[in-house]
Amino acid sequence: MKTVIFLGVLLTTLGCTSTTRYTQQSPEIDLVKSGISNYVNGEWEDYSSNYADGASIFFNVTEESPATIQETIASQKLSVEPFSTYAFDREKDEYEMVVTDKGETWVNFWGTWKGTLAATGEEFVIPVHLTYQFVDGKIVKAFGYWNNAEIQMTLTELAKEAEEIAANQTSD
């Protein structure tokens, strides 16, 4: 009889066990937070260590155009070069981790990037969404979406002005 009761309790306990499918606190979220800090601080080796070998990164591109972590870091270094300061507004960051019906683990991030253009002092404020797929504690896929058109237009205008100044100096 004790065995039957024990088996009943065991089966009930096992039957009620479920994995967490949604959370706002996890080691994966902590890894994303540290990766964002690494980006802001220019700690590129630490930043890249969060990614699995062969990770595919899709920042403002479709899945037909993946980048490696090395390509992504090179691109990010270039994109922040014109700025005297840049950071995320950490007080407004939002994170969540979900486990899909297929058992995939994803971390989503919503934040606000702020940067000050060195040449003009103009501040840019850009909403950012990032989502990361994790396998064995490493990022295997990353998607990122933000609109940097205003920055690009400003940089294009500054380059045009610099060309005009250079042309005027040459003709004098």
Say what each PLM segment does.
Residues F109-K138:
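Exposed beta-sheet edge and beta->alpha loop/turn motif
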Residues C16-N41, E45, E161-S171:
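Short, low-complexity N-terminal intrinsically disordered segments enriched in polar/charged residues
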Residues K141-D172:
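Low-complexity, intrinsically disordered terminal/linker segments enriched in charged
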Residues M1-C16:
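Sec-dependent bacterial lipoprotein signal peptides
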Residues S49-N50, K102-E104, Y132-I139:
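Short, solvent-exposed coil/turn segments at beta-strand boundaries
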Residues T100-G103, E123-V125:
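Extracellular/periplasmic catalytic domains that process cell-envelope and extracellular macromolecules
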Residues Y51, V61, G111-W113, L130, ...:
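A mature extracytoplasmic/lumenal domain signature
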Residues W44-V99, T105:
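A solvent-exposed, acidic/Ser-Thr-rich amphipathic alpha-helical stretch
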